[in-house]
Amino acid sequence: MHLPTLSLVEELIARRSVTPDDAGCQALIAARLAALGFEIHALPHGPADARVDNLWAIRRGQGDGPTLVLAGHTDVVPTGPLERWHSDPFVPSHRAGLLYGRGAADMKTSLAAMVVAVEEFVAAHPVHRGSVAFLLTSDEEGPAVDGTVKVCEWLAARGERLDACIVGEPTSVRQLGDMIKNGRRGSLSGRLTVVGQQGHIAYPHLARNPIHLAAPALAELAQQRWDDGNEHFPPTSWQMSNIHAGTGATNVIPGELVVDFNFRFSTESTPESLQQQVHALLDRHGLEHRIAWTLGGRPFLTRPGSLTDALSQAITAVTGLRTELSTTGGTSDGRFIAQICPQVVEFGPVNATIHQVDEHCEVAALGPLKDIYRRTLEAMLA
């Protein structure tokens, strides 16, 4: 175990930072970074009743070198049923070499390891090249509209150059270091409304049943091959998540059918091309329809280069593992950072219990995680 990292992650877990509440996590981290000579910028955003806390902190070195950003979120998801937890989710607890608490894996362990890694790096290299920065938000587990995306807009307006970024998401699968995420698929959601005509169920000739009308089109959408993917991404997928029609009465043909759906799309497709294909298919089926579209994020990919090399080599040096680069899984705030930063990867602890009751991480992995971050800093900035 590594006591400085353990102590900090316990302090962070003890703060009830259920999204979008930061609960003082960023102030705690900012104080430690300020002591290292970081410029601190608190960037709150959003309405007063749902304020999001954001933090940008940067330590500028001397001479040429990249700006390496360590990014993450201080918010956590709700606990779920407290009675199912074996201990209070906001009281750090140890059992059998595991640290339990909400955020233990996603992602307060990564934040603590990053902070301590930077403290060790600055102590060893007080005069370093390039810059090291932190980008933190309390709006990753929520709508993600007042968090990282707003900080990125602010950074772009200031002309701040970002060269590389590590997002501390829990990417490891079976053991620390076995996977780096070097990209993510895009996410495009839609709410489809198919218009029919309400009527009595005994007189279908006087009505138009939107369920019956839409069924063939929905079946075709589910079977459609949108693209073939590529060496980095699987083929684009389309999935329905919710279907609703009817008044609740059993003798009424509904007037509308509402379907929620989502694309997870590769770099072989664009939001515009997918939207066009969906509308064309529905038109071909003769459906009167409308769709409210929401673009959650475009896909991004960081090809092997200086950042993936430095991080991969650090993982091998600390764990002995040869890591895997992968683009699987859901979206993260990396999708926003990738719009202003050419190299974005995600790396953190094992993700087996994230968002679950009794979320936990392995205490013995805290030191190695911190060492991996520190070695990456040294490779790029020392």
From Swiss-Prot:
UniProt-listed Pfam families: M20_dimer (PF07687), Peptidase_M20 (PF01546)
At the highest ranks, the source species' classification is: Bacteria, Pseudomonadati, Pseudomonadota, Betaproteobacteria, Burkholderiales
InterPro entries cross-referenced by the UniProt entry: Bact_exopeptidase_dim_dom, DapE_proteobac, Peptidase_M20, Peptidase_M20_dimer, Peptidase_M20A
Identify the gene encoding this protein: dapE
Q: Which top EC class applies here?
A: hydrolase
MF terms in GO: acetylornithine deacetylase activity; cobalt ion binding; succinyl-diaminopimelate desuccinylase activity; zinc ion binding
The entry's free-text remark on the cofactor is: Binds 2 Zn(2+) or Co(2+) ions per subunit.
Keyword terms of this UniProt record: Amino-acid biosynthesis, Cobalt, Diaminopimelate biosynthesis, Hydrolase, Lysine biosynthesis, Metal-binding, Zinc
Answer whether the UniProt record assigns the keyword Hydrolase to this protein: yes
Return the protein name.
Answer: Succinyl-diaminopimelate desuccinylase
* Entry binding sites for Zn(2+) 1: H73, D106, E169
Q: What does this protein do?
A: Catalyzes the hydrolysis of N-succinyl-L,L-diaminopimelic acid (SDAP), forming succinate and LL-2,6-diaminopimelate (DAP), an intermediate involved in the bacterial biosynthesis of lysine and meso-diaminopimelic acid, an essential component of bacterial cell walls.
Record-linked CDD domains: M20_DapE_proteobac (cd03891)
Catalytically driven reaction(s): N-succinyl-(2S,6S)-2,6-diaminopimelate + H2O = (2S,6S)-2,6-diaminopimelate + succinate
Catalytic residues, per the record, are: D75, E140 (proton acceptor)
| Residue numbers binding Zn(2+) 2 | D106, E141, H355
Q: Which cofactor does it need?
A: Zn(2+); Co(2+)
- Entry keyword Protein biosynthesis: no
